[in-house]
Amino acid sequence: MTKSKSGLSFLWLSAVTFLLDLSSKYFVVKNFELYESINILPVFNLTYVRNYGAAFSFLADHDGWQKYFFIVLAIAISLMLCYFLAKNQATQKLQNIAYALIIGGALGNMIDRLYHGFVVDFFDFYWDIYHYPVFNVADIAISLGAGLMILDAFKNRHEPEQRTE
């Protein structure tokens, strides 16, 4: 019986995502003051903010328990997705890429929470006075991974079998 490569071969993408995320956050923390903003395009700024919650600052205004909740959640999701990668064949590229991106992003934000107690965000898109919530490389990876999982679910849907009577 021939052994085929598993989806774990995609963990290099998690490592690249993780390193890009941490290096971009390091750059922002070292070169920006808190809330400092540099205009890049008419609809885009680099703005250093601290996020004590999750996406869209969900749970940010609580007493600090959410930090530990999100750390445990990131570990649990990353372990679960590593298990899925181990079970997947390397040929399941879309799903493996999705899992790897989510793992890299989850671990990047988790390290921020462990080290700083918050997540460093800096991509600030806006139109006129309306700003989209500020985000980071890890958030992009998690969102892309989730989108690819949805795409993969639609791509792999099978037509229901027709019953003959």
UniProtKB/Swiss-Prot annotation:
Database matches in InterPro entries: Peptidase_A8
Cellular localisation: Cell inner membrane
Key word Nucleus present: no
GO cellular component: plasma membrane
Top-level taxon in the UniProt lineage: Bacteria
Any one GO molecular function term: aspartic-type endopeptidase activity
Signal peptide span: none
PANTHER family hit by this protein: LIPOPROTEIN SIGNAL PEPTIDASE
Function: This protein specifically catalyzes the removal of signal peptides from prolipoproteins.
Record-given protein name: Lipoprotein signal peptidase
Species lineage: Bacteria, Pseudomonadati, Pseudomonadota, Gammaproteobacteria, Pasteurellales
